[in-house]
Amino acid sequence: MAWCPWKHDLLATGSTYPDGKIKIWSTSSISGRNSEPLHTIPLNTSVNSLHWSPHCKELLSTQGSSFLHVPPPRSSRRNNVSRADSALTTVQTPLTNSIAVHEYPSCKRLLTLTQAHGSSVTHSCISPNGEHIFTVCPKEEAIKMWQVWAEPLSLGMKESPFAKFTIR
């Protein structure tokens, strides 16, 4: 889960097997048990961590194993078996053990760093300056640092022509 730093009512959540989706919620529009998310990003991959960029409207996700819904045999289909009853198989996809950056609010994937680690990226954190992501893979016994976002452009205040003069 991750709260959005520049739009305080946005909460991103990620799910694992068998759902494998990122959901973005607005706490100002949640009403009761049957609330729907503002956006859903289907990945068919375990979403292990999420981070909003403090500098731009982007959401970073780290992933683990990917999976595919396998339809039941033909004999089962005649009995109206739903997708929920279908088997799930672990597969290798570009999102397996990856880092992905998604644009908000379009939810378009801007970047995928495939195979960021050789196994599941189990945890990550954002650096204090909001530019780097640190990822952990216990199976590799490795911590990696990734520069994801650049330093924000400083708009800087121009000095007023009257700044050097005081009334008192």
Language-model regions, residue ranges each:
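A beta-strand-loop signature enriched in Asp, Gly, Thr, and Trp
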Residues: M1-C4, H8-C56, S61-Q63
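Terminal intrinsically disordered, low-complexity extensions flanking WD-repeat/beta-propeller proteins
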Residues: R33-P37, N44-N48, S53-E58, Q63-R168
